[in-house]
A protein has these predicted regions:
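Structured mid-domain segments that build the active-site/substrate or prosthetic-cofactor binding neighborhood
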Residues: 12
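Positively charged, polar, low-complexity stretches
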Residues: 2-9, 17-121
Length: 121
């Protein structure tokens, strides 16, 4: 995807939903994005992508983690050069919003379906 090509590969902010190709995701504005980044600061990665890459098991683990926590981190131990494409694939399959990629860690958010279960937005 073209929007993943950035000069600063250390940090990446996902586009807003006006440019997004995933129509069922919620729109996150810059203030909400900053709030999610602050909330994710103390969170440890719950999913680690290793030598096997993004498998169905990884997708299922990300989906279950998003249901339980809404906001998660994914760490890339392998495939560091392809982290943007892999994160894009995970976001598409799990219907999640990419908050930011910092280094080899991606922060993903998916709002809970029930309003009483929502923790962040």
């Amino acid at each position: 995807m073209d929007y993943f090509k950035t000069k600063n590969k250390k940090s990446h902010i996902a586009p807003n939903s006006k440019n997004s190709y995933i129509k069922s995701m919620i729109e996150i504005n810059s203030k909400q994005r900053k709030l999610l980044e602050k909330a994710a600061h103390d969170i440890q990665p719950v999913v680690i992508v290793g030598g096997a890459g993004v498998t169905d098991g990884v997708i299922q683990m990300v989906d279950n983690s998003l249901i339980a926590h809404e906001l998660i981190k994914i760490k890339y131990n392998e495939y560091k050069d392809e982290k943007f494409e892999l994160t894009d694939e995970i976001c598409q399959k799990c219907d999640a919003n990419l908050v930011r990629i910092i280094g080899n860690v991606a922060i993903l958010f998916r709002q809970a379906e029930k309003e009483e279960d929502r923790k962040y937005l």
